[in-house]
């Protein structure tokens, strides 16, 4: 308890400004080096706590256009006979028909959910006829959309320009808002059209119908004195409110998971930049508390209270394995996903010895978005002993941490440090890991391509830590074959250039004149250029192979302080564009303005 009291005192002193900051040279907020753009717009015009804006005006969301029925020549067949579908049933049939060549339509769960929801959209007489998905033929529908996509690819330059102008006009009308007197870009002003839910991993709701959203589903958020957006003709908004403690412009509930969706500001906006900056600053602040927190949870492994022991072991997993805390779910929710606090006995196996290590814990469960988390990891002996204790006399479906809830864990984290959550731990460990990996992997003398490979390897370590997986892309084999073909062709060019260089060297040795020397230098430069190109292709192939099942983008955009990457780019003379795309550079404009080459997380 002494450590907890010290942590609370430290947190209070930090809020009062009494705890000394780290030296400016380490890139701490407040240092000139870090605050390179001290007049940046995300630092100006701050409101009191909780208030995000004074003025918010926008045009509302853009709705998906109404469904256009299929041409008469495109038919749906059942048991080999054409069936004329009602407009509602036909629209849902097109969602499936578009995906006919996709892996999803081979999955039983997807097919079952689709057929159940499709039948709900059918007229009574259609349901009496169409009783089995296996007897349905969507071939003509699929071919129609394939041909339509192919036609779009061969549009004339004038037709493409016209489509581009229409998109820009839409962007100008709906894609911007006025926030406190400044024009800000909106991130996603289009409401998602209806379709079939896919989900990630083996989601139990895949194939279900995502219904069309109408203005009657949408809540508008804007300032009281602004012009309220006009709903489409013949419609009205579900509600209009003025809540300046949130940053969304419109919200609605989607039909599959009953989750709330939002129209938000673009990530490069002032408010989003400020929010991201504060998120990473909170994670940086954990650095001053983390040693004491770790000492505390280690001490709690021996607590007399079972609740305290369970909390300490859970916190160890959140810290060391970057597990999510896990939120309590409503009874009957279909997806059996869990986090650290909701782990069951069946999700954990204990091995006294495995893979040459002692006290190994094997995790196997479905995490967020139904992504499988599988890991075998050695743990400290007290953790192993406690897990044995927690699992005693329990059935496989019983909770591992039966005295712990997400709410009680979060409350404890707040007591340790103001603003501390499991996600802050995740962000801290991800960012620290990237920084340490970059330091260990990068060599100043490496080529740009080799440095980028080192960066992606560091990013990969973080993605694996955070369990950011992806399925191997369907185009992977083909793209690798193309890459290997390029590598082979480049090797042949290098061999030919090397032979030409030998001949030029022999000629120069025999003649010794200026002309032969010029030819020799030209051949040498060509060989160097080709060798560099070959090295880049080889690095690209290695990078592609290593990351075929790892999603680097999720951690890069959400869990890694961009100032670490920008400082690394500046320190090792790597163009920032090699790490962040144009859109990502706009998103992290605040970090580009702040981070010097000596920034440390």
Swiss-Prot record:
Residues 261-262, 324-329, 421-423 are annotated as: Interaction with DNA. The lineage of its organism: Eukaryota, Metazoa, Chordata, Craniata, Vertebrata. Ubiquitous; highest in skeletal muscle, heart, brain and fetal liver. Its main location: mitochondrion. The active site is at residue 559. It catalyses: ATP-independent breakage of single-stranded DNA, followed by passage and rejoining. The keyword Nucleotidyltransferase does not apply. It is found in: Mitochondrion. CDD domains: Topo_IB_C (cd00659), Topoisomer_IB_N_htopoI_like (cd03488). Residues 22-48 are annotated as: Disordered. Gene3D superfamilies: 1.10.132.10, DNA Topoisomerase I, domain 2, Topoisomerase I, Chain A, domain 3, Yeast DNA topoisomerase - domain 1. This is DNA topoisomerase I, mitochondrial. The record marks 152, 200, 248, 279, 337, 368, 410, 468, 486 as: Interaction with DNA. Its EC number is 5.6.2.1. Divalent metal ions (calcium or magnesium).
């Amino acid at each position: 308890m002494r450590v907890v009291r010290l942590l609370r005192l430290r947190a209070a002193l930090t809020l009062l400004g009494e705890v000394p900051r780290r030296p400016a040279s380490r890139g701490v907020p407040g240092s000139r080096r870090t605050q390179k753009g001290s007049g940046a717009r995300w630092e100006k015009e701050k409101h009191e706590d909780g208030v995000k804006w004074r003025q918010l005006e926008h045009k509302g969301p853009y709705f998906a256009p109404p469904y256009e029925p299929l041409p008469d020549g495109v038919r749906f067949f059942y048991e080999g006979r054409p069936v004329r579908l009602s407009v509602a049933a036909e629209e849902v049939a097109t969602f499936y028909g578009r995906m006919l060549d996709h892996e999803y339509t081979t999955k039983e769960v997807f097919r079952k959910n689709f057929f159940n929801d499709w039948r709900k959209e059918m007229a009574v007489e259609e349901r009496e006829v169409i009783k089995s998905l296996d007897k349905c033929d969507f071939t003509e529908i699929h071919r129609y959309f394939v041909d339509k996509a192919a036609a779009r690819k061969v549009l004339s330059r004038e037709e493409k320009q016209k489509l581009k102008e229409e998109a820009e006009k839409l962007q100008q009308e709906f894609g911007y808002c006025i926030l406190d007197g400044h024009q800000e870009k909106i991130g996603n002003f289009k409401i998602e059209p209806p379709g079939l839910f896919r989900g990630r991993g083996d989601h139990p709701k895949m194939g279900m119908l995502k219904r069309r959203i109408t203005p009657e589903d949408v809540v508008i958020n804007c300032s009281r004195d602004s012009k309220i957006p006009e709903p489409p003709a013949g419609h009205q908004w579900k509600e209009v409110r003025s809540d300046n403690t949130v940053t969304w412009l419109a919200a609605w509930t989607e039909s599959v998971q009953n989750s709330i969706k939002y129209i938000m500001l673009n990530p490069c906006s002032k408010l989003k930049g400020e929010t991201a900056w504060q998120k990473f600053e909170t994670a940086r602040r954990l650095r001053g508390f983390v040693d004491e927190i770790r000492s505390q949870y280690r001490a709690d492994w021996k607590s007399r209270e079972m609740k305290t022991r369970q909390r300490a072991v859970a916190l160890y997993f959140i810290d060391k394995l970057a597990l999510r805390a896990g939120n309590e779910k409503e009874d009957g929710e279909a997806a059996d996903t869990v986090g650290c606090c909701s782990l069951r006995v069946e999700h954990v196996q204990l091995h006294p010895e495995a893979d040459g290590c002692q006290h190994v814990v094997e995790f196997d469960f479905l995490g967020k978005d139904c992504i499988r988390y599988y890991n075998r990891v050695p743990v400290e002996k007290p953790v192993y002993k406690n897990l044995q204790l927690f699992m005693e006399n329990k059935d496989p479906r019983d909770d591992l941490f039966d005295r712990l809830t997400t709410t009680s864990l979060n409350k404890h984290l707040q007591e340790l440090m103001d603003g501390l959550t499991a996600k802050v731990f995740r962000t801290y460990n991800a960012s620290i890991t990237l920084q340490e990996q970059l330091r260990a992997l990068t060599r100043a003398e490496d080529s740009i391509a080799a440095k980028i490979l080192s960066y992606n390897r560091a990013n990969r370590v973080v993605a694996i830590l955070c369990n950011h997986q992806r399925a191997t892309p369907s185009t992977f084999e083909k793209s690798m074959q193309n890459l290997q073909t390029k590598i082979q062709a480049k090797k042949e060019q290098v061999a030919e250039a090397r032979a030409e260089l030998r001949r030029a060297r022999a000629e120069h040795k025999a003649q010794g004149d200026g002309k032969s020397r010029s030819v020799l230098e030209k051949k040498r430069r060509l060989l160097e250029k080709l060798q560099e190109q070959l090295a880049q292709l080889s690095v690209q192939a290695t990078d592609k192979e290593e990351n075929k099942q790892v999603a680097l983008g999720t951690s890069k955009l959400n869990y890694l302080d961009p100032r670490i990457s920008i400082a690394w780019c500046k320190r090792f003379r790597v163009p920032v564009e090699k790490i962040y795309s144009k859109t990502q550079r706009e998103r992290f404009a605040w970090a580009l303005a702040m981070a010097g080459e000596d920034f440390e997380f």
